[in-house]
């Protein structure tokens, strides 16, 4: 009834118009008075009930009730009222009195004593934050906190149909901290709090992996962000360091969100976000102090926190001090709530080390218990520590160091060198020391290296050595827990090239190479990290699980202070017992070249001055090598580049690949966008200058196992620009997550420059962010190999079935690139091939595509293929690409036109020749000539035909007469000279037998196809004249 009355009174006050007059406290019907009258009414009812039963109620004692404040009214006033405890019947409760103002609160270490309404100090074993609350116990999710897992991608189909949903994704309590999800779901840790006055929220966190988005923001009770600013992005921290974050809170309801979203594009596991010690200031008063949690204590009044019990002690809830364990049979970790029995010792409880060399050059193998020692040797099944003291010969000094007769190795003086087994010697004239470090013998930890151990959840291994030397290798130490980070650091103040290469530009300054192996039975991980100028530690590469002995090289291109870090973690799950103590990593050698403070294992040739007396080394100009005969600087030949590893001898100048040329300083090779190819006695000229600007390809979409949609974005800088790498890929995740740095610092950059680079793009709608996200930018190519029509160059091969066959007869041109950085999956680095194809239907920049069988552009993750189709990839036009067409002759003039061959497979180049006119004879003239000749020929043929016909008739007649005459005279020879002349006929013609043919005879013979004489002697035979 009291609560109902309070709500009604409060509701009536809220219903007052905003501009209406306020009710004075002295009015009998103010909300506070209504509450008081309601309380009095309740007491009267209780009294009436008791009197009606005939049983008088006892007077209320202080133990029978407690005080509370009413809700604040619109004037900021409230009343203190007495509330009977449950199951207590009494009478005579104290009357309501005016309470403290609503914004009142006590200081840290104090609480509000409600009887007198004054602040009092907390007693021993308790603590108070005053007007704040603190969450530092994460054995389970504290009351008021909630987990909400959402999937913000817009994929087709209901979320229930996804093979792997987000229902099991949540923040996980880990004892002293809470850990975020590791997948690509969006999980929010939510806490709602109502503040009586302005305050703040403060928490500590560890956030080292930018493959997870980490946001902290605040909403009101209407689910609206209080301040929609970029401050919600939490900054990255270094490995092992706890950062802090605080945000001001407004009075009223504040809903706090810790939200993480994983961006998983590969197989590597991400490091989760860790949060601890959440403190909220500005809440209502506290009327009591909180008891210290088990494992902590408070030994003085007015404490605002409790201290953790040291190791081998424990405490219960509300303890004033810690109780020691029985040290001979029990132990406890720091902050323990109880002691546990010590287990028997096993082989997992000790490790071996090598002592420094003694004066005899011997080292001892020593066995030590893992500290702190928690096992017992006096139990039945316990093992004892193996005997120590076995002596072995010390390994020699590392290259660049020498032994001066003592038990330690010393660096060689400047200008000298040693292989580690002999004394230091001065470099001969014309040479200089090859500075660097080569650590391959591990008897003691080198001076510029240090080792440590830390754990995000406890301090067991603080002060321990994370790594131990072991003769021919250095190995991970025991640590305090299986999830410890075992740290090994190498500090190098800077890098510089050899003297002869001081003027070179664009080349590497040095490199660090190490040989290692891991032996693991669980999910161990080895991280290799680089810190530049002590500002940002970034993970360069990581290896999980057991790895065979292998080498890894990291190239240095910038002169800065570097700290290289190797961090080894056996497992990411913390447990009380040690299960993976035998999981180790071994590093056999670490080599750093061109270190500023390095030592020399050998000497290398250097260039001498031009003067005869000069004996000191001088730097060569860029692109010059050292001539062996004279030790003088000499420029590399054209189209060669200078090796970044050695400059001695002409062989240091390496020829450029096909179709490429060197820069002026011979630092690298590049394509000037022109290419020439001989084909069938024809030279094809290609001009790719219009494609020299960066070409882009957005490929996808693809989806992760959780369904996150992402795209692969490629940038290609094909040629030109004097070899400058114009393709840039950005990481805009780092715009929100990188640590604060000095303005203008270029130690940490969000841009990746290369010939070919790749970014992973997550669209804005995929994760509910306001802009698309670009992450995981990698260099696919930073070295140009060459350009050729062949499909293979330097072990990069384009298979015939990789792309569709070109419909043209113009050969495709191939640009080949590679990356100088090796990875665990690509030991020889990545390589890229770009196939340029002539396609007149693709004007301008054209279209870039990837193989259909490799939608990500690569089939193995190491070699990338692209097909770039454009009209600009066609060869320049020549005289072979057009032909002429002759027009009709008109009025004595003829027009000659030139047209391109179809289909046209060329661009630009030469232009079509202008049409030209030439003199000619018209068709009418030749028609007339032809008609005349034809008519004459026809008349001649008719005349000849008639002549020969008539001639033939006469001969036939004479022949028949001759035959008839011969038969009638029965073989009498003719008496006349003429043949068959009848009476009345004139002897008009004389028959002359002659072998000579006249002109007409020749024509007749041609007509009758006779080859011999026209008239041959014919012997006529008759049966009656056998003698003839």
Curated annotation (Swiss-Prot):
Gene3D superfamilies: Tumor Necrosis Factor Receptor, subunit A, domain 2 (2.10.50.10)
Compartments where located: Cell membrane
Protein's UniProt name: Endosome/lysosome-associated apoptosis and autophagy regulator family member 2
Positions carrying Phosphoserine: 1017
InterPro entries to which the protein is assigned, alphabetical: Elapor1-like_3rd, Elapor1/2, Elapor1/2_C, Elapor1/2_GBD, Elapor1/2_MRH, Elapor1/2_TNFR-like, Growth_fac_rcpt_cys_sf, Man6P_isomerase_rcpt-bd_dom_sf
Organism: Mus musculus
GO cellular component: plasma membrane
Taxonomic placement: Eukaryota, Metazoa, Chordata, Craniata, Vertebrata
Function: Functions as a regulator of the BMP signaling pathway and may be involved in epidermal differentiation.
Keyword check for Transmembrane: yes
Gene from which this protein is expressed: Elapor2
Record's bilayer topology term: Single-pass type I membrane protein
Residues in the signal sequence: 1-47
Entry's family note: Belongs to the ELAPOR family.
UniProt domain MRH: residue ranges: 671-876
Residue stretches spanning the membrane: 929-949
Record-level Gene Ontology MF annotations: BMP receptor binding
Positions in the Cytoplasmic compartment: 950-1028
């Amino acid at each position: 009834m009291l609560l109902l009355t309070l709500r009604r009174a409060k509701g009536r006050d809220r219903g007052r118009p905003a501009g209406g007059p306020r009710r004075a406290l002295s009015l009998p019907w103010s909300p506070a008075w209504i509450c008081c009258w309601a309380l009095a009414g309740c007491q009267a009812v209780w009294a009436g009930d008791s009197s009606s039963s005939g049983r008088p109620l006892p007077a209320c004692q202080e133990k029978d009730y407690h005080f509370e404040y009413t809700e604040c009214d619109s004037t900021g006033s409230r009343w203190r009222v007495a509330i009977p405890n449950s199951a207590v019947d009494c009478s005579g409760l104290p009357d309501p009195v005016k309470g403290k103002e609503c914004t009142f609160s006590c200081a840290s270490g104090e609480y509000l004593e409600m009887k007198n309404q004054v602040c009092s100090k907390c007693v021993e074993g308790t603590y108070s934050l005053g007007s704040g609350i603190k969450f530092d116990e994460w054995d389970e999710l504290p009351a008021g906190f909630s987990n909400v897992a959402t999937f913000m991608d817009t994929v087709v189909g209901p979320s229930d149909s996804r093979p792997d949903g987000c229902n099991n994704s949540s923040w996980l309590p880990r004892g002293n901290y809470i850990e975020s999800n590791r997948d690509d779901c969006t999980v929010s840790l939510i806490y709602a709090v109502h503040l009586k006055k302005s305050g703040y929220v403060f928490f500590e966190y560890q956030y080292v992996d930018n493959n997870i988005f980490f946001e902290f923001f605040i909403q009101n009770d209407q689910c609206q962000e209080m301040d929609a600013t970029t401050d919600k992005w939490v900054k990255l921290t270094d490995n092992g360091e706890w950062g802090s974050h605080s945000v001001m809170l407004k009075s009223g309801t504040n809903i706090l969100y810790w939200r993480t979203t994983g961006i998983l594009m590969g197989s590597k596991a991400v490091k989760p976000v860790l949060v601890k010690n959440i403190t909220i200031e500005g809440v209502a008063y506290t009327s009591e102090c909180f008891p210290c949690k088990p494992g902590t204590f408070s030994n003085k009044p007015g404490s605002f926190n409790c201290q953790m019990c040291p190791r081998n002690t424990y405490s219960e809830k509300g303890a004033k001090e810690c109780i020691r364990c029985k040290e001979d049979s029990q132990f406890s970790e720091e902050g323990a709530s109880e002691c546990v029995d010590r287990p028997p010792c096993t082989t997992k409880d000790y490790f071996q080390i090598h002592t420094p060399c003694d004066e005899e050059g011997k080292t001892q193998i020593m066995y030590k218990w893992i500290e702190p020692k928690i096992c017992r040797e006096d139990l039945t099944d316990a093992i004892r520590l193996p005997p120590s003291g076995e002596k072995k010969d010390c390994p020699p000094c590392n290259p660049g160091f020498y032994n001066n007769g003592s038990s330690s190795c010393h660096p060689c003086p400047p200008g000298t060198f040693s292989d580690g087994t002999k004394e230091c010697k001065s470099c001969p004239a014309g040479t200089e020391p090859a500075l660097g470090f080569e650590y391959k013998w591990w008897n003691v930890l080198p001076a510029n290296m240090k080792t440590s151990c830390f754990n995000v959840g406890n301090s067991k291994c603080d002060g321990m050595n994370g790594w131990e030397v072991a003769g021919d290798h250095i190995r991970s130490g025991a640590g305090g827990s299986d999830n410890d980070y075992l740290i090994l650091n190498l500090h190098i103040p800077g890098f510089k090239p050899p003297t002869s290469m001081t003027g070179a530009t664009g080349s590497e300054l040095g490199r660090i190479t190490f040989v290692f192996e891991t032996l693991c039975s669980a999910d161990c991980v080895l991280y290799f990290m680089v810190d530049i100028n002590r500002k940002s530690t970034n993970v360069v590469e990581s290896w999980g699980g057991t790895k065979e002995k292998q080498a890894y090289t990291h190239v240095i291109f910038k002169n800065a202070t570097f700290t290289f870090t190797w961090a080894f973690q056996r497992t990411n799950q913390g447990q009380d017992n040690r299960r993976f103590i035998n999981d180790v990593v071994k590093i056999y050698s670490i080599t750093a070249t061109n270190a500023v403070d390095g030592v020399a294992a050998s000497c290398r040739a250097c260039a001498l001055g031009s003067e005869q007396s000069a004996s000191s080394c001088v730097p060569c100009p860029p692109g010059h090598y050292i001539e062996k005969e004279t030790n003088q600087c000499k420029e590399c030949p054209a189209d060669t580049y200078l090796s970044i590893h050695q400059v001695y001898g002409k062989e240091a100048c390496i020829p450029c690949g096909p179709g490429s040329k060197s820069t002026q300083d011979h630092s690298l090779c590049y394509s000037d966008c022109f290419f020439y190819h001989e084909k069938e006695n024809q030279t094809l000229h290609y001009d790719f200058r219009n494609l020299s600007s960066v070409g882009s390809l957005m490929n996808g979409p693809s989806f992760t196992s959780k369904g996150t949609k992402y795209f692969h974005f490629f940038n290609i800088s094909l040629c030109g620009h004097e070899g400058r790498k114009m393709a840039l890929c950005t990481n805009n995740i780092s715009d929100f997550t990188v640590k604060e740095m000095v303005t203008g610092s270029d130690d940490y950059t969000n841009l990746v420059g290369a010939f070919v680079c790749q970014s992973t793009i997550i669209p804005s709608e995929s994760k509910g962010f306001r802009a698309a996200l670009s992450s995981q930018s990698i260099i696919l190519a930073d070295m140009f190999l060459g350009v050729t029509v062949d499909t293979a160059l330097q072990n990069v091969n384009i298979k015939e079935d990789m792309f569709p066959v070109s419909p043209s007869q113009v050969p495709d041109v191939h640009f080949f690139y590679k990356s100088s950085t090796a990875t665990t999956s690509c030991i020889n680095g990545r390589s890229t091939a770009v196939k340029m194809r002539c396609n007149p239907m693709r004007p301008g920049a054209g279209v870039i595509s990837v193989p259909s069988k490799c939608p990500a552009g690569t089939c193995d993750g190491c070699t990338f293929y692209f097909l770039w189709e454009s009209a600009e990839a066609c060869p320049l036009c020549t005289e072979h690409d057009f032909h002429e067409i002759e027009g009709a002759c008109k009025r004595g003039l003829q027009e000659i036109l030139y047209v391109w061959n179809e289909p046209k497979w060329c661009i630009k180049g030469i232009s079509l020749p202008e049409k030209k006119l030439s003199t000619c004879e018209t068709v009418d003239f030749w028609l007339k000539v032809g008609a005349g000749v034809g008519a004459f020929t026809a008349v001649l043929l008719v005349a000849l035909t008639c002549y020969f016909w008539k001639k033939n008739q006469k001969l036939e007649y004479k022949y028949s007469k001759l035959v008839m005459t011969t038969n009638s005279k029965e073989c009498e020879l003719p008496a006349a000279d003429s043949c068959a002349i009848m009476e009345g006929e004139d002897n008009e013609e004389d028959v002359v037998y002659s072998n000579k043919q006249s002109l007409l005879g020749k024509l007749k013979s041609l007509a009758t196809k006779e080859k011999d004489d026209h008239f041959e002697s014919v012997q006529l035979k008759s049966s009656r004249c056998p003698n003839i």
